């Protein structure tokens, strides 16, 4: 079920530009101008050379570095992120831990989804 939720969640950012803008703003605040890094550098291996993410304290907050992934050459020019997808996966898998370990991300996720038009 995680994969289905993850892939369906990508459509939220794609179909609602305001959600993508909110994701970019959250990432900007969370990473504080840090550089894009290869996902292979962040997690070891297994990703294509062009897959990049912003380092943050994802792991220390119970999450995964993949949450910082963006699609594009920069955050400003990103056409998608992984925030909604990985956030929804985590919310469904471990809601109590998500709240306890990264309330900031959970609050971003809930408020962003709540603000979407019906």
In which residue ranges do the predicted regions lie?
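Active-site-flanking segments in enzyme catalytic domains
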Residues: 1-118
